[in-house]
């Protein structure tokens, strides 16, 4: 995104629940909550819950949860509400990573007073589908990030659900383009699991590298890309070893679209003297090897939707955040580029935003030179 987004510093203890902080008792059956009455609410009436998908999914994950939480904190700060956990916002973790446990946790959050819940990631697809199917919690708003309520290939929406999608292919494109314009010729992509968002990041990365190679007049095969999925989003020393092997084999920079597993890739870069590209949020502070991060504006989208909810303008349905509304971007302010400039970034960003460049968002787990129309980049699937 072209404008620098300021992240709100987090404060307060991390142990309180809504109820422990003086939240009102749950309304009796049939009673109206602020979300039901119509008209704008007082900011203090907005009670937000961020729900984790598993016990391993922590708040300070330096990735997806953190980005959503930053948007929540921005809302609190802009409305003079206490920052951190407790008060008007809380983070909930399930005791296990099942749909039943997630639904139980959602119920717990609502019982504690939450009237708008943020659900980060594809792991909530089936749980929210079941909630809609059973007409549970119709007066509570749900913000599902990176997914839609889905089961067995069927999508089901409701008026109290916002399903937020990001143009990861555009963000990935910027990362691949910048890497090649910076002078790197050996690139790598390590995705976590081949879910649509990760696939779009990877396919965009390849297309960006191809576009840069064409812009620079490079020969066919001069830019090479190793491409793989790690099979999980959790860190593993084996991933650091694999990344180090890629670097020793001639790869200059690896784009790690892998959640927590990205930390292992960064460790491999540190060991082998390689470089990395972060994902989702600005991860530049995690390692000096990170030259930039392919961002989706989790904080912006979460803030906007909660703010609209407060103003009685909740946007239900499937929402798209892309270059046109600063929904994606590349971390430039913290970047460690030596050659690629802000002006170059802005020029290519504007071409994506105005439609001059259209990045293919087709989702097929393993890319190929044929389905991405590659003529210059040499792709190796691993």
Regions found by a protein language model. Give the residues of each.
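C-terminal motif of bacterial Sec signal peptides marking the signal peptidase cleavage site
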Residues: 15-20
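A residue-level marker of the well-folded mature domains of exported/periplasmic proteins
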Residues: 25-382
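Acidic, polar-rich N-terminal leader regions of halophilic archaeal proteins
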Residues: 2, 21, 35-36
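Hydrophobic helical h-region of N-terminal Sec-dependent signal peptides
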Residues: 10-14
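Bacterial N-terminal signal peptides that target proteins for export
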Residues: 1-8
């Amino acid at each position: 995104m072209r404008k620098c987004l300021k992240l709100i510093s987090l404060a307060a203890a991390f142990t309180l629940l809504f109820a422990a902080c003086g939240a009102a008792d749950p309304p009796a059956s049939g009673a109206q909550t602020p979300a039901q009455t119509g008209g704008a609410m007082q900011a203090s009436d907005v009670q937000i819950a961020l729900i984790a998908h598993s016990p391993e999914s922590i708040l300070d994950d330096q990735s997806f949860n953190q980005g959503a939480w930053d948007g929540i904190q921005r809302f609190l700060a802009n409305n003079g509400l206490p920052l951190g956990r407790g008060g008007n916002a809380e983070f909930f973790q399930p005791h296990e990573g099942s749909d039943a446990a997630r639904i139980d946790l959602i119920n717990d959050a609502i019982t504690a007073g939450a009237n708008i819940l943020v659900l980060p990631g594809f792991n909530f697809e089936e749980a929210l589908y079941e909630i809609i199917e059973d007409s549970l919690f119709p007066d509570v708003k749900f913000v599902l990030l990176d997914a839609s309520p889905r089961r067995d290939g069927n999508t089901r929406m409701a008026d109290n659900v916002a399903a937020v999608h990001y143009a990861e292919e555009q963000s990935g494109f910027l990362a691949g383009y910048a890497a090649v314009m910076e002078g790197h010729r050996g690139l790598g992509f390590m995705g976590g699991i081949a879910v649509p968002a990760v696939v779009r990041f990877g396919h965009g990365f390849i297309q960006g590298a191809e576009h840069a190679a064409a812009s620079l007049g490079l020969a066919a095969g001069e830019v090479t890309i190793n491409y793989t999925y790690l099979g999980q989003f959790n860190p593993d020393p084996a991933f650091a070893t694999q990344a180090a092997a890629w670097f020793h084999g001639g790869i200059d920079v690896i784009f790690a679209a892998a959640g927590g597993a990205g930390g292992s890739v960064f460790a491999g870069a540190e060991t082998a003297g390689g470089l990395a590209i972060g994902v989702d949020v600005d991860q530049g502070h995690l390692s000096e090897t990170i030259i930039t991060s392919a961002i989706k504006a989790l904080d912006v989208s979460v803030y906007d939707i909660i703010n609209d909810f407060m103003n009685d303008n909740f946007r239900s349905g499937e929402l798209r955040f892309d270059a046109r509304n600063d929904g994606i971007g590349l971390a430039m302010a913290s970047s460690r580029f030596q050659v690629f400039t802000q002006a170059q970034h802005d020029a290519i960003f504007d071409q994506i935003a105005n439609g001059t460049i259209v990045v293919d968002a087709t989702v097929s787990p393993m890319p190929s030179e044929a389905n991405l129309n590659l003529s210059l980049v040499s792709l190796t699937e691993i």
